Structure formats: C-alpha cells, structure tokens
C-alpha cells in the first residue's frame, strides 16, 4: 500500500497537464466552445484566429480546423443521418456538401507567441452533436465536436 501512493501521485502529475488540452472552458457550453474553435464565416489569418482559442486554454493548440460557414448551417448537419464517431458513439453526422475551411498548424512559439501555418481546404466534415444546454441556440441538436475532415 505504501508503494501505491507515490505511484498514484506520479500518475496524477503526469496526467494533469494533459487533461486540460481536451477540456473546454467550463463557463462555456460545449456548443459555444465548438463555435469559438471551429466556426469562422470569414477566413482570418491563422495566428490571429488561433490567439482567440489559445487565450482560453493558455497554451498553443497544435492543430485546429476552421469551417467557413455559419453556426446555423453547421448545426443543420446535426439533423442528417447519424453515423459512428471515432470514439464509437453514434452521435456523429456528415455534411452533405463540402465547405471551405482552413487548417491551422503550429509551426513555432510558446504561448502567447504561437505561430501557425495555414492550408485552405474544400472538404466534407463530420461533427458530433448533442442536445443543447440551457444557453445554447434552440436547435434539436447542436455541434459539440469536429470529429473528422474528409
């Protein structure tokens, strides 16, 4: 039992910094965080666009994709046929048409001086959708995760 505590402490220390990378800011709903991270109707330069995300998380996100469409149009994808997500849940939905998007990838820097490269794309996307929370728009389902780009 004496050996368990140091091992548990080591696991918590190693796991601690990784956990926030996948979490969303608790003062935001998952749908609002999705909108901040992935909805950008008019393309912005990646360094500028990513600073908005990185200011919430206090670190340089390694990669992010911005869909150049409205939240309303992306939320409408949630009404399409459900498919299996990467995590094996059945709450994903594929867009019926490709959209313009920008893929931003970290090239250098440490927060807050993060630097990104940009790649314009025109592809289909898959989003995970959940029922809305109280402060979300009143759709039946809202996008909460960008599962993949096709």
From Swiss-Prot:
Residues 1-23 form the signal peptide. The keyword tRNA-binding does not apply. The keyword Iron-sulfur does not apply. Induction: Up-regulated in CD14+ monocytes in response to the uropathogenic E.coli strain CFT073. Ribonuclease which shows a preference for the pyrimidines uridine and cytosine. Has potent antibacterial activity against a range of Gram-positive and Gram-negative bacteria, including P.aeruginosa, A.baumanii, M.luteus, S.aureus, E.faecalis, E.faecium, S.saprophyticus and E.coli. Causes loss of bacterial membrane integrity, and also promotes agglutination of Gram-negative bacteria. Probably contributes to urinary tract sterility. Bactericidal activity is independent of RNase activity. One of its GO terms (biological process) is defense response to virus. This is Ribonuclease K6. The lineage of its organism: Eukaryota, Metazoa, Chordata, Craniata, Vertebrata. The record marks 59 as: Facilitates cleavage of polynucleotide substrates. The gene is RNASE6. It comes from Homo sapiens (Human). Belongs to the pancreatic ribonuclease family.
């Amino acid at each position: 039992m004496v050996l368990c505590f140091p091992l548990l402490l080591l696991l918590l220390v190693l796991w601690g910094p990784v956990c926030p990378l996948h979490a969303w800011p608790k003062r935001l709903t998952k749908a609002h965080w999705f909108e901040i991270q992935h909805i950008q109707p008019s393309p912005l330069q990646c360094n500028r666009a990513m600073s908005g995300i990185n200011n919430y998380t206090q670190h340089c996100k390694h990669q992010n994709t911005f869909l150049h469409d409205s939240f309303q149009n992306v939320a409408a994808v949630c009404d399409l046929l459900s498919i299996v997500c990467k995590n094996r849940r059945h709450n994903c939905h594929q867009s019926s048409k490709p959209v313009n998007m920008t893929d931003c990838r970290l090239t250098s820097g440490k927060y807050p001086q993060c630097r990104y490269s940009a790649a314009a794309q025109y592809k289909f996307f898959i989003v995970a959708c959940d029922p809305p929370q109280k402060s979300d728009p009143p759709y039946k389902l809202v996008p909460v995760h960008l599962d993949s780009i096709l």
